Amino acid sequence: MEVDIRRVALKHALANAVKFGGKARVDSVVSKVFAEVPEARKAAKEVVELVKEVVEEVNSMSPESQASLLSELWPEALSGERKVEVKRLPPLPGAEEVGGKVVTRFAPNPDFVLHLGSARPAILNYYYAKKMYNGKFILRFEDTDPRTKRPMPEAYDLIREDLRWLGTPWDEEYIQSQRMEVYYEVAEALIKSGNAYVCTHSQDEIKAFRDAGKPDPCSFLPPEEHMERWEKMLSGEYPEGAAVLRIKTDPAHPNPSVRDWIAFRVLDTEKTPHPLTGDKYRVWPTYNFACAVDDHMLGVTHVLRGEEHAVNTLKQEYVYRHMGWKPPVSIHFGRMNLEGMVLSKSVIRRGIEKGLFSSIDDIRLGTLRALRRRGILPEAIWDLVLEVGIKPSTARVSVDKLHAFNRKYLEPRANRYMFVPEPAKVASIEGLEAPITAEVIVHPSFPERGRRRITFSKPEVYLPSDVASSMVRLMGLGNFEVVDGGSKLRYLNNDVSFAKKHELPIVQWAPVESSVRGRVLKAAGTKIEEISGYGEPSLAELPPGEQVQFVRLGFVRVEGPETYIFTHD
RNA sequence: GCCCCGGUCGUCUAGCCCGGUCAAGGAUAUCGGCCUCUCGAGCCGAAGAUCCCGGGUUCAAAUCCCGGCCGGGGCACCA
């Protein structure tokens, strides 16, 4: 045994010394020894002493003899390969207990379309339920506020579309405004068991009780009284604001907002009708109540949501406790700030109202529809979300990162086209007989996609203004000498290797007679840049939605005739 | 102010739960080279991290414990 350890120590001491300029470190060698011979941990102190001796010996040797001894005894120790890591999120706690039947949900308020911020919970919840576990993914519309965050009738469908595009199809769908009776029933049970009560104090009075950490006088009334009040709430005898149903928690809870939080309130739906149910209901559950009840009723096992919901989890646990239900596992992830993109719902909405943004898919915005219009692929959003993962700390991700992921997917798909941006130069061609024919490569990585033929008779082309050399290569057409300050191009040959050898700039061009005018729209912070120019004739045939690369310019998505939206470099 | 939660290359992240194969791996951005009919892609290389700071436990701490600092979230009859 002793001998074995000494040998192992010698091996790692040598390897360590060779790796770090002749001096091995005791700590590192000890670690390696334990890794190779885990049993040795039991006699850790002795091993350390032994390693110290060995390291001393090794360090007194010359680097050359260390290396030669190592390669003689353990040649394999010289190759330092590393483990490869697989990109995958950590498993979910509590997934075993449910036998891998993980049920998650995505629960948006249908008051707006989805944006990059909402993509995170959508993808994460979908990923765990459907990709990592063999479970169920639920879509639930949380539209229980007809007053402050009024649902937008179109939003239900817009969100469904957004999710389908994102690649997170759902197994079941629920709309909270259609489930009011469910919430009423649980409310009644809680009142009867003395765990909820109707309070008729004003908002200010309730706040005062909370701040003081004192119980609400209403809470001392018997359940029968509260049942009566509850009936009166439902029958419309209390005007808006006159009564609320509160959940008993702890009047002195360290977090004042948890103290007997409000589960239902009266809303005047004649004044502010709900887009789906009109004025049918006047008593509305709050987010925390509806959410708690639904998560249980729908069998949700895991809730993944942002850290802004941390206190809500705390509140909702009281409903579970009172009802004797088992709460789902909650995981809170941190904020994801996307630098250089407008994400906030309220800012977007205000911007659209003020005319700052044209619409919900204005290319400067971070809505999923805007990203799609810009040519961002859902796969790229997935990569971004999965990379950021479920860490609780705030992540400041850059648009560059999103673009890098997107480029990975877009690059092979996007065929190459030529587009000459303004200011373009017109040059006449000498030395080629009309009709002139060029063959441009459709995609350099995929020769099987072939070449595109451009034929024209009038010997004039548009050139990008950055052509300043005495010779230039026009892609697919030939090498030229630049004469008369760039107004003339004299044909030399069509040999790519000539261009390489003489280091000619290789540029895009467009025939003047059949070029297609176009403009590229580019989101630049709060502005939209417009780059107009001339494209090769086949641009006219590209269908809207097609994503291509404008050579030497960047990737674009075809918006419509003559309009292209810049995706990224 | 009160209540939570965090802190690893510029940025994002792996490792942390269960201390040792980590003098810290990957990605992105940057810089160089090769390759390419693009300023795209690919390949190779460089540089980049006092693992927030201080203390403690231990043979051994990015990992466990305590304190500090800094950052974030919440404090609605919104979701």
UniProtKB/Swiss-Prot annotation:
PANTHER family: GLUTAMATE--TRNA LIGASE (PTHR43097:SF5), GLUTAMINE-TRNA LIGASE (PTHR43097)
Entry EC no(s): 6.1.1.17
Subcellular location: Cytoplasm
Primary location: cytoplasm
Matches recorded under Gene3D superfamilies: 2.40.240.100, HUPs, Ribosomal Protein L25, Chain P
Functional description taken from the UniProt entry: Catalyzes the attachment of glutamate to tRNA(Glu) in a two-step reaction: glutamate is first activated by ATP to form Glu-AMP and then transferred to the acceptor end of tRNA(Glu).
TM helices/strands, residue ranges: none
Catalyses which reaction(s): tRNA(Glu) + L-glutamate + ATP = L-glutamyl-tRNA(Glu) + AMP + diphosphate
Family according to the record: Belongs to the class-I aminoacyl-tRNA synthetase family. Glutamate--tRNA ligase type 2 subfamily.
CDD domains in alphabetical order: GluRS_non_core
BP GO terms, sorted: amide biosynthetic process; glutamyl-tRNA aminoacylation
Motif ('HIGH' region): 108-118
Species whose genome carries this gene: Thermofilum pendens (strain DSM 2475 / Hrk 5)
Gene Ontology terms for molecular function: ATP binding; glutamate-tRNA ligase activity
Assigned keywords, A-Z: Aminoacyl-tRNA synthetase, ATP-binding, Cytoplasm, Ligase, Nucleotide-binding, Protein biosynthesis
A GO cellular-component term linked to this record: cytosol
Name the record gives this protein: Glutamate--tRNA ligase
Pfam family, one: tRNA-synt_1c_C2
Superkingdom field: Archaea
